[in-house]
């Protein structure tokens, strides 16, 4: 059975995923650190798992829980690289799919930016998440779940 696992601490498309999976038989598991705790009532097909705060604690739990039938949504390139051979699909919250053909470039870019910061330099970060980004994600996610 397909499940969507969301790296939920900073994911701007949680509500979209919940809405688009309602009535499909697809379950959603949101993993968050306790510092992002919420009392929000969620539909029955959605489970939230809270993880102790700590560097990469949520990422490690996602790797541990993920199965070959899962779809994982994350903006973390390192986590995505660990999951590519483990799950069905790894998606970014802007809608693009992580693949073995693009992950090395993304990781190299992340490394280069870290080196610039380490030397006291600055680099341009990503633009703020927009309504168009949300629409693009929803189109891509609909396409993914349609193919299941």
From Swiss-Prot:
Entry-linked InterPro entries: UPF0178
Pfam family, one: DUF188
Family named by the database record: Belongs to the UPF0178 family.
Name used for this protein in its record: UPF0178 protein SH2212
Lineage, highest ranks first: Bacteria, Bacillati, Bacillota, Bacilli, Bacillales
